[in-house]
């Protein structure tokens, strides 16, 4: 991709540079004179970054790169556009290989995971839009009310790229859609993430994904695997030990057993029992994957939590809690803009660390304090050093309030690159580069 020679003029131009580099390869581009695709993409991300309470509030002060305003009608009409949605979706998809090229992959250190595409998946809900209709659940005596907007996302565990799967489609009279119903609706190639031939996809999902027949089909047809936690009411029958745990290998600390069991429906499933050395909490994992070591599956599932932390980032720190508009396209657009914003923040933060040598020293000091006061279990567990699984990832699972507030200010004021670095150095408590 061509390098933007002027990407360091302002923090605004640096932040949007990956988007500008990716756009020429995107699907369904169109040169709209009133609101170009790039202006629209920047507009949506800026809306996510803004502290404004509504779209009208945001548009009253927003200016495009040429200092012109965006009409309210233009913005909300653009949110309905199927073509713009296709373009936005493809740009965010293009950021996935872009992030793989630019961000570190801590999981690359695990040789067994070569050629694996690793995802944490989950649903997340927003409050209904202002003009969403009220509905009444079937056979309910309650007054009609608005339904929340449900979205399903996947987080790439290698790069933390956030991708969008689908909008929830609740049955008539219901307020939400079951995760499994959404998964079954997807094209299997989409779930593979268009992984190359010979590669495999692995989903870490919560208990809502359990349907052994569906995952057997996904595995047989497209090389898609899953792991989840066992339900408390699951009925399984022991078949045989799958592997013997080698306790001389520090990576196996906490593993109790690795077995094959039979579900009540007759499916052979791998069951891994693990006790967290730090807390003594027992976990039982179920998976249809039979080539990876048990410790790898435990490690991956432990970091399924990263997608929950990402939702916290978007809801609590970006304050994206409510749908922007009522149309299905607009709701999907909103979710894709949230993904794009998260991904651009990750790229900018890494650039500042790698290129400018900047790091959040305030957060590092807070982490030390948290570690001292964090509950570490009782008895002998209090003095145990962190296990291999518990200390593997060093990366942050979300961006801090300090970073987001600094970025929000720099984007709105179009602060110069050098001044932005000075402001961030003050915020992070680190030297000015």
Which ranges hold each PLM region?
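A short, flexible helix-boundary coil/loop motif
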Residues: 1-26, 32-34, 243-274, 278, ...
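Short, conserved catalytic/metal-binding motifs centered on acidic residues
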Residues: 43, 58-59, 70-76, 116-126, ...
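Active-site-proximal, Lys/Arg-enriched surface segment
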Residues: 76-157
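A conserved active-site cap/scaffold subdomain adjacent to cofactor or substrate pockets
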Residues: 280-307
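Short amphipathic alpha-helical "interface-anchor" segments enriched in bulky aromatics
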Residues: 297-325
């Amino acid at each position: 991709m061509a390098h933007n020679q002027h990407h360091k003029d302002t923090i605004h131009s640096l932040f949007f540079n990956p988007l500008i580099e990716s756009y020429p390869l995107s699907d369904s581009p169109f040169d709209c004179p009133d609101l170009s695709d790039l202006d629209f993409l920047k507009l949506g991300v800026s809306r996510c970054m803004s502290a404004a309470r509504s779209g009208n509030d945001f548009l009253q002060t927003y200016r495009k790169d040429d200092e012109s305003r965006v009409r309210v009608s233009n913005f909300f009409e653009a949110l309905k556009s199927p073509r713009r949605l296709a373009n936005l979706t493809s740009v965010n998809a293009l950021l996935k290989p872009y992030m793989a090229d630019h961000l570190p992959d801590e999981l690359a250190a695990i040789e067994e995971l070569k050629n694996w595409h690793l995802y944490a998946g989950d649903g997340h809900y927003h409050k209904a839009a202002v003009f969403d209709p009220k509905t009444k659940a079937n056979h309910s005596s309650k007054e009609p009310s608005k339904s929340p907007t449900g979205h399903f996302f996947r987080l790439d565990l290698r790069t933390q790229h956030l991708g969008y799967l689908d909008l929830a489609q609740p049955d008539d009279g219901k307020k939400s859609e079951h995760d499994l119903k959404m998964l079954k609706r997807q094209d299997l190639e989409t779930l593979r993430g268009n992984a190359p031939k010979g590669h495999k996809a692995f989903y870490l999902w919560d208990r809502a994904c359990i349907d052994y027949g569906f995952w057997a089909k996904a595995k047989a047809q497209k090389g898609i695997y899953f792991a989840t936690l066992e339900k408390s009411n699951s009925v399984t029958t022991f078949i045989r030990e799958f592997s013997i745990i080698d306790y001389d290998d520090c990576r196996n600390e906490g593993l109790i057993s690795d077995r094959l069991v039979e579900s009540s429906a007759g499916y052979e499933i791998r069951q891994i029992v693990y006790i967290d050395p730090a807390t003594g909490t027992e976990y039982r994992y179920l998976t249809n994957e039979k080539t990876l070591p048990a410790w790898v599956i435990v490690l991956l599932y432990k970091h399924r939590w990263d997608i929950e932390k990402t939702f916290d980032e978007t809801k609590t720190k970006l304050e994206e809690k409510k749908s922007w508009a009522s149309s299905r396209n607009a709701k999907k657009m909103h979710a894709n803009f949230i993904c794009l914003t998260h991904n651009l923040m990750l790229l900018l933060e890494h650039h500042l660390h790698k290129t400018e040598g900047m790091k959040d020293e305030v957060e590092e000091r807070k982490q030390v304090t948290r570690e001292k006061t964090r509950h570490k279990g009782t008895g002998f567990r209090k003095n145990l050093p962190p296990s291999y699984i518990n200390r593997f990832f060093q990366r942050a699972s979300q961006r801090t309030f300090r970073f987001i507030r600094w970025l929000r200010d720099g984007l709105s004021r179009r602060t110069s690159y050098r001044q932005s670095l000075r402001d961030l150095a003050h915020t992070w408590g680190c030297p000015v580069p």
